[in-house]
Amino acid sequence: MKKIKFFSSFQDEEKWLEQMAADGYKLAKRNTLQTLIYTFVPAPPEQVCIRADYRVFKTQHDFQDYCTLFEDSGWYHIAGTKDSGNQYFKRIDENSNEDIFSDTPSRAERYKRLSNNAFACCFFFVPLIFGGLMILNLDAFLNPRALWVTPGLWESETNFMWWRAFLFEMPFALMRGYVAPFMIFLSTTFTLFYLFIMAKSRKIYRMMLNADTD
């Protein structure tokens, strides 16, 4: 079962995942790049303590050491990969602490890591926006013929040579007129989404640090 959810707070996400576990749905996967898709599998209902972290690892060995460290402390890694960022743990030892973080600064650091990674994701989409703008042809919305730039195409007689030129250029014409606007829209949407995550996470990070010093 897949569910689409967005959380700006790890605490709210943890509570929701615990409720899903109580309803008989175990978290199996959270998509990468901070997307909103959670994958669950049916499981016996259980009252469980779930905690979330955010880390990206350079090597698989570092990731495995990270999971092992938590497991030795009574927390089992239930979802997340080396590159996914979002990491989820279930408490398996009732004698372990109720949190995977020892203090507020370390708990706040996950928001800083999330903010930095969201900002980095923006750089993937910005070139796509500029690339789309470079090939965009606004005249196409009023005059679709303008998408075909072969000289004299529309003044030529409709014959075999005309159809060959028309069909040959069609993929490029569609890209200029329709793929480019879609690419610009999609890339802009993702860029704004990641900028929002960056700003929101940075704000929570600062609030947590300020609250800890008061």
What label would you give each PLM region?
Residues 1-214:
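Terminus-proximal functional modules
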